[in-house]
Curated annotation (Swiss-Prot):
Binding sites annotated in the UniProt record for NADP(+): G187, A188, G189, E190, T191, I192
This enzyme's EC code(s): 1.2.1.70
Function (record text): Catalyzes the NADPH-dependent reduction of glutamyl-tRNA(Glu) to glutamate 1-semialdehyde (GSA).
Any further remark recorded for this protein: During catalysis, the active site Cys acts as a nucleophile attacking the alpha-carbonyl group of tRNA-bound glutamate with the formation of a thioester intermediate between enzyme and glutamate, and the concomitant release of tRNA(Glu). The thioester intermediate is finally reduced by direct hydride transfer from NADPH, to form the product GSA.
SUPFAM superfamilies in the record: Glutamyl tRNA-reductase catalytic, N-terminal domain, Glutamyl tRNA-reductase dimerization domain, NAD(P)-binding Rossmann-fold domains
Keyword Oxidoreductase attached: yes
Superkingdom assignment: Bacteria
Residue ranges crossing the lipid bilayer per the database entry: none
GO MF annotations in UniProt: glutamyl-tRNA reductase activity; NADP binding
Gene, per the UniProt record: hemA
Annotated site (Important for activity): H97
Protein name: Glutamyl-tRNA reductase
Length: 419
């Protein structure tokens, strides 16, 4: 087994190049088929996401540049355009890279959990296309267990590192269960869409989307089962909301102190969380002066995010140590397999010599040969055959002036004890 990882990612390549080299579902099967048709490739897995394209291979003697050339031809991208952005990892470096990727240590957002699912899907797709050999199977399964260990032993994924996620995390801290809470989302842009996804993933089913245009809001409503209202209708529905998360492009505040004060009276002063992640602000700052209204601005959330990013960097130190330990252990296992193969081949060779000479000796005895002479000849020939290769190795090491190699051979033959 000889491992090779070749790829590009968000650190080395522009989004335009990443788009060109991406393996969509329509290309993946053909790509794996072409890789496996190569006599030098024992197994392969292709990982292709918006931020990276990587090819992992178990190879035997294949030149690294041949794999790059294949990528170039397959995607019809010139080598001159591709090569400056390519990175190549071999053996333990390839093992360590895959483990870092699976753990989220090589991600654009440090510690993000989605990449593990993407690596698992890449492995499954490659296995379904019968391109995963036993060695690749072992490598990827080990990488999954390392990612699980990192998640268990560190807090690298435990803190919010996006404003949208931080808003949802804040809501979970304040309310015992957001599954029982009604959430009013003001706006229908990308940030609010991310917020809705995080809320839905945490069990929230009661969402109201308020937007200037109903068309955009209807898309979110259909995806998340939300109710749609216009911005003008917010005063009539605000009292229903336990949580308000707002992100619009409005130049003026949409939710004022008086509007919230009225809603709180209708709610009989049940607490209301308002998270304003718009710039300029959607919620008047004076709302924060009201009892039972808890207002957080984008700056409040950003400070939480910044602190969490720093915390993830601290946790990443321990995660990197785990990956280094596990990749070294896996490399040792790989080397032990190579030793097993060598031992098996050496025993096979010795047995073939023994059987050949024994057969000749038995024939001599059957023909009436002197048993003593036959046995003496057998022992001499067996000795000469078995020591021929080690003798040549000793001579070669001595002639080439390689004392270290000579010492290793002598130790292997039991001629001197290891220090």
């Amino acid at each position: 087994m000889s491992l090779l990882a070749v790829g590009i990612n968000h650190n080395t390549a522009s989004v335009e190049l990443r788009e060109k080299v991406a393996f969509g579902p329509d290309k993946l099967s053909e790509a794996l088929k072409q890789l496996n048709a190569n006599a030098h490739v024992n197994g392969s897995v292709i990982l292709s996401t918006c931020n990276r394209t990587e090819v992992y291979c178990d190879v035997k003697g294949v030149a690294k540049n041949k794999l790059i050339d294949w990528l170039s031809v397959f995607h019809q991208v010139s080598p001159e355009e591709l090569k400056p952005s390519i990175y190549i990892h071999e053996e333990q470096a390839a093992i360590k890279h895959l483990m870092r990727v699976a753990c989220g240590l090589d991600s654009l957002v440090l510690g993000e959990p989605q990449i593990l699912g993407q690596v698992k899907q890449a492995y499954t797709d490659s296995r379904d296309n019968k391109s995963v050999d036993a060695s690749m199977e072992k490598l990827f399964q080990k990488s999954f267990s390392v990612a699980k260990r990192v998640r268990t032993e560190t807090e690298i994924g435990g803190s919010a590192v996006s404003v949208a996620y931080a808003a949802c995390t804040l809501a979970k801290h304040i309310f015992e269960s957001i599954a029982e809470s009604t959430v009013l989302l003001v706006g229908a842009g990308e940030t609010i869409e991310l917020v809705a996804k995080h809320l839905s993933a945490n069990g929230c089913t009661k969402m109201i989307v308020a937007n200037r245009t109903r068309e955009r809001a209807l898309g979110l409503a259909e995806e998340f089962g939300a109710e749609v209202i216009s911005l003008n209708e917010i005063p009539d529905h605000l009292h229903r909301a336990d949580i308000v998360i707002s992100s619009t492009a409005s130049p003026l505040p949409i939710i004022g102190k008086g509007m919230v004060e009225t809603a709180l009276k209708t709610r009989k002063h049940q607490p209301m969380l308002l998270v304003d992640i718009a710039v300029p602000r959607d919620v008047e700052s004076q709302v924060g002066d009201l009892n039972d209204a808890y207002l957080y601005s984008v700056d409040d959330l950003q400070s939480i995010v910044d602190g969490n990013i720093e915390q993830r960097k601290v946790e990443a130190i321990q995660a990197e140590a785990i990956v280094s330990e596990e990749s070294a252990a896996f490399m040792s296992w790989m080397r032990s397999l190579q030793a097993v193969d060598s031992i098996r081949d050496y025993r096979k060779s010795a047995n073939e010599i023994r059987e050949e000479l024994l057969s000749k000796s038995l024939q001599s005895l059957a023909a009436g040969g002197d048993p003593e002479k036959v046995l003496l000849e057998l022992s001499n020939k067996l000795t000469n055959k078995l020591i021929h290769a080690p003798t040549r190795a000793l001579q070669s090491a001595a002639e080439q002036g390689e004392p270290a190699k000579l010492t290793v051979i002598r130790q292997s033959l039991g001629l001197e004890n290891p220090q």
